[in-house]
Amino acid sequence: MGDYPALPVQLDSDRVIPFYSYLAKEFVFADHHFGSGSNSTPGHMLAIGGQMPTLKNPPFIGPHPVWDLPSIFTTADAGHVSWAAFPDQGGYPTKLYTSLTTTPGSANVFPPKDFIPMAKAGTLPEICYVWSPSGYDEHPPHVSDPTYITKGHDLVWERVQAVIDGGGWADTTFILTWDDWGGYADSVPTPVIETVPDALHPDGWVAIGGTRIPLIMFGGQVMQHIDSEWHSHASIPKTIMDLLGLPPMGVPRVDTAPTMAHHVDASLKRAAPPVPGSTIRQPTPPTPRPTPVAPAPWAGPLGQSLPPLVTRDGSVVPAPTDGLVRPKPPKPPVIR
């Protein structure tokens, strides 16, 4: 974390990530979605249960903390809705939740290799959270590898096709996003919703608001739309809850989050995307070119301190203050 200037970089999306580019143009692209102001683990946990007990990454190997927090999975259990989680090879990030590492919840946690066979067989439950395994998560490698984005992009494509092959396209709503921004400063400031003080920011830096993160929503019943509303990863479980009629989670950040459920229309029968490996013909640009729509102001309170966490067992988990502050920006990447 730190205060860095934005780095002007352009990416040829149609060439490098053609499947993502196609989905963003054909379905719902959220251009004002955001995560946390920190890194991977807070982002994942915000998307699972709307809370962040830490602002840094716990050890990926060896002993690690476990928290007894509500999540979309405990909420699904309360609503008698089936679910499954497919974390990476090491069980990250579901291994950070008590309810997902103990019975009965652990029985619904599968290794990444199981997703495609289950999808093709049509045996997936109603809710699935699916993470990319290590090596396919689109994180820049320590050693140069020009294929690192392609590998992750193509795995997502294959997984979507597996759902299609299993007959699930017509009634499946996909939400594709990333744990964090993964880059440098964003050129568009997000709302200052919740803050945490540190050595560089005695009045607080933006913990919720963070940086914008791409989010694409697609499926057989998902409309074509640019969603310019401000919403965070907490809107992911909120949207699932609204689509499936689940009870409140009991986490205010989730229960009051903006929903994206209105992008789903049961009367729609959208065509499935091209099959993996095919040459994608991108949609024809609209004429006239749409005018960008500014988002409405954030409807909730602003400038609030990050609150203590809601737990399942009634224990007290204070708001995290363990973020690592870096006064100097990292070395910019070499642009080729």
Functional labels for PLM-detected ranges:
Residues M1-R336:
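N-terminal pro-sequences and low-complexity stem/linker regions of secreted or lumenal proteins
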